[in-house]
Amino acid sequence: GYSDNSNGIKAFDIAYNDIENAFKYYLKYFNNGNRIVLAAHSQGTHHLQKLFKEYLLKNDSILKRIELSYLVGDRAIKAFTVEDYPLCENPTDLHCFLSWNSYKNGFSPYNLRNTNIPVTNPITWINNGDASWYNSHGGILFSNYKFIKKGNQLNYPKMVSAITHSGFLWVS
């Protein structure tokens, strides 16, 4: 991984600098003071955490416009304190972050066991460890935004259950 050697760390830093510069450019030329939703996946989750630590948390005028932040697809080790930018606790929360890294039900990566990693169940939008059973899964919207069934219903409802457990999202 990028954390195992100096060239990997350099590559990560170069990528992060591109992201920070692109975000600043967006704010200056395109945002026009509008609200912001941030989303990151996998390695991007690490970049977004760094953007929070090094830029966003130091800029209240920008931070207050961030409605939600999705730190998905990798462990979101808390890069900030709850007072700075909290983990969302229910579906109506704003100005907070959501995070999950999903695995097959029961699987725990050996290097992440017994850690305190923030996690949100994306079916219920709650992080209290309660399971979302198949009947609460509304369905899937495909990336082309097409509905298979008539009436704009989501496809394949009640197909997934999930539970947060020790920093993981277990899915079945």
Where is each model-derived feature located?
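Surface cap/lid and interfacial helix-loop subdomains adjacent to catalytic sites
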Residues: 20-32, 54-171
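Gly/Ala-rich beta-loop-alpha elbow adjacent to hydrolase catalytic centers
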Residues: 39-48
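Short glycine-rich or small-residue beta-strand-to-loop segments that form or flank ligand, phosphate
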Residues: 37-40, 69-70
